[in-house]
Amino acid sequence: MSIISSLTNAGRGVVNTVGGAAQGINSVKSSADRNIALTKNTGSTDSIDATRSSISKGDAPSAELDGTANEENGLLRETSMLAGFEDKKEALSNQIVASKIRNSVVQF
């Protein structure tokens, strides 16, 4: 191997090293620029933060109202069931009375 080819190979190695480092720096910069652009284009988070506190303040009363609504729905179902029993009981009573009336009319 001659001195010229050795120097040429060494020069290529230096150029490749410098080129690789430059590409690495460029990749890091591109990634940082892309992340900055994404952050800028998503808008402000102030409105999200303001809404989050309002939502958390309303969560406890909302849960309490849900519990009350569940209790009321249970009472409504029970009342409807009792009303249905009363209707059936009244219908049965009416049938008994009608049957007695028929029997008493037939006996005369």
Swiss-Prot record:
An annotated GO cellular component of this protein is: extracellular region
Its localization reads: Secreted; Fimbrium
Question: Compositionally biased, Polar residues: which spans?
Answer: 41-56
Q: Kindly report the protein's main subcellular placement as a broad class.
A: secreted
Which residues are connected by disulfide bridges in this protein? none
Q: What induces it?
A: Expression enhanced by contact with host cell wall. Also regulated by HrpRS and HrpL.
Keywords associated with the record = Fimbrium, Secreted, Virulence
Question: Which parts of the sequence are annotated with region: Disordered?
Answer: 41-73
Which purpose does this protein serve, as stated in its record?
Major structural protein of the hrp pilus, which is a component of the type III secretion system (T3SS, Hrp secretion system) required for effector protein delivery, parasitism, and pathogenicity. The hrp pilus functions as a conduit for protein delivery into the host cell. Also, affects the expression of T3SS-associated genes. Required for full expression of genes that encode regulatory, secretion, and effector proteins of the T3SS. HrpA-mediated gene regulation apparently is through effect on the mRNA level of hrpR and hrpS.
Which family would the database say this protein is a member of? Belongs to the HrpA type 1 family.
**Protein name listed in UniProt:** Hrp pili protein HrpA
